[in-house]
Amino acid sequence: MRRISVKKLCSFCLCACAFAFLVMTFQVIELLGQFEQTEHRQQIKRFEDIKVQANAHVSDVQYPVIVWWSPLTGELGRLGECGHNRCFFTVNKSYYSHPQTKAFLFYGTDFSIESLPLPRHKQHQWALFHEESPKNNYKLFHKPLITQFNHTATFSRHSHLPLTTQHLEDINTLTAQTHLLPLSYKNHLRQTLAPVVYVQSDCDPPSDRDTYIRELMQHIQVDSYGQCLHNKDLPPHLRDSTAMDDQDFYKILAQYKFILAFENAVCDDYITEKLWRPLKLGVVPVYYGAPNIHMWLPDNQSAIVVNPNEPPKKLAQYLKRLDKNDWEYLKYLEWKHKREITNINLLKELKERPWGVQDITQDNFIDVFECMVCSRVWENIHRQEEKLPPKVWRAEESHLTCPPPKLFDFALSSSSSLRQMWGASYEQSKREARALAQMLHTNTNFTITQFWREVFTD
């Protein structure tokens, strides 16, 4: 009987402890919930305070106001220092009517006819930042619209702030041999790997690259890891687009002899990481994109430039020849082994550009773009003080231009609707650019209905 009582006592104690633990757990959860609610309320209050503060100062700003009409930076208000000049930068559109507002900044991809700061007052300057593909907003690539802007920062070398080398950190990154593998090892890997690799998941873009590469694959083996023309899998942790700069991804690409570096659009100066990546890894890029690419290559023989007027079969034959001839192949890597950049234009651009890439010691190109506009605003303020006429900046057609998309005429078993769309989209954007320029000339607000009526009566 005594032993049974002890067992009952132990059971009771265990139950009591468990109950106490549950009570304490619920109390902790409740306290955490209260804390989170309080913190959430405080965050909301802080955000509301910022909004109130920003709105409270709408009439108090003593510096030139520059409004990001596209919410690229997300900053409600910031006093930026640009050398000896200061400007107030904000995404708050209520500053449109502020007497100190001097300029509006637009991000090309977000530029929309549905929201424009109109009417455009005499002192209002427009500035365009657009470093991306023309397919993001074809309207901007036509003379009637691009010339509506006063200041530009685009991939074109002719823009006021050229961003042509936006994907290239510096010369040292280009000449480094961190990922360069011996050719003898690459030859050994050819037992299991194709000589050529392709990695793209943005299929059927305006450059029609997938059509060309599909035909090329009929004549030479290509390992395709992306969603486009896929025939080989990446490890699971590398399948997301955010892994394109992962060291493991670099190691896979570095094993190949050739990388197909085909841009999604064919425009002068439109050069992306598709070119720079293989050059940094010590792989020979087979490049199709900017027609003036030789202006930017580190060496005259650092890439194989695709001639779109020649059949892919001819390119395949050339790649096969290089694959079998080490001496000829190594000519394309001689600059890499010597760590020698012979292109004076590229060296000059990287030395003189006023911004850096992934470099905390330099300003980024968005900050430099803002300061370019700020400095020009102040230049005219000083000219006005000296009773001089204002200086006028105006974008030119060359600041953002690209020819119509051109499809390859290879026989296709199937053709996507997206592939067929780009030509029509380009022509439509041309009409839209003309119509919008006409509407802007009236300098009054307009409705979407009025705009489309102008488009279709053009």
From Swiss-Prot:
It is an enzyme of class 2 (transferase). One of its GO terms (cellular component) is Golgi membrane. It is found in: Endoplasmic reticulum membrane. It catalyses: L-threonyl-[protein] + GDP-beta-L-fucose = 3-O-(alpha-L-fucosyl)-L-threonyl-[protein] + GDP + H(+); L-seryl-[protein] + GDP-beta-L-fucose = 3-O-(alpha-L-fucosyl)-L-seryl-[protein] + GDP + H(+). InterPro entries: Alpha-1_3-FUT_met, Glyco_tran_10_C, Glyco_tran_10_N, Glyco_trans_10, GT10-like_C_sf. Pathway: Protein modification; protein glycosylation. Glycans are attached at residues 92, 150, 300, 445. Residues 1-11 are cytoplasmic. Its EC number is 2.4.1.221. Residues 33-458 are lumenal. One of its GO terms (biological process) is fucosylation. GO terms for molecular function: alpha-(1->3)-fucosyltransferase activity; peptide-O-fucosyltransferase activity. It comes from the Eukaryota. Disulfide bonds join 371-374. It is a single-pass type II membrane protein. The chain crosses the membrane at residues 12-32. Keywords: Disulfide bond, Endoplasmic reticulum, Glycoprotein, Glycosyltransferase, Membrane, Signal-anchor, Transferase, Transmembrane, Transmembrane helix. Belongs to the glycosyltransferase 10 family. Protein O-fucosyltransferase that specifically catalyzes O-fucosylation of serine or threonine residues in EMI domains of target proteins. Attaches fucose through an O-glycosidic linkage. O-fucosylation of EMI domain-containing proteins may be required for facilitating protein folding and secretion. This is GDP-fucose protein O-fucosyltransferase 3.
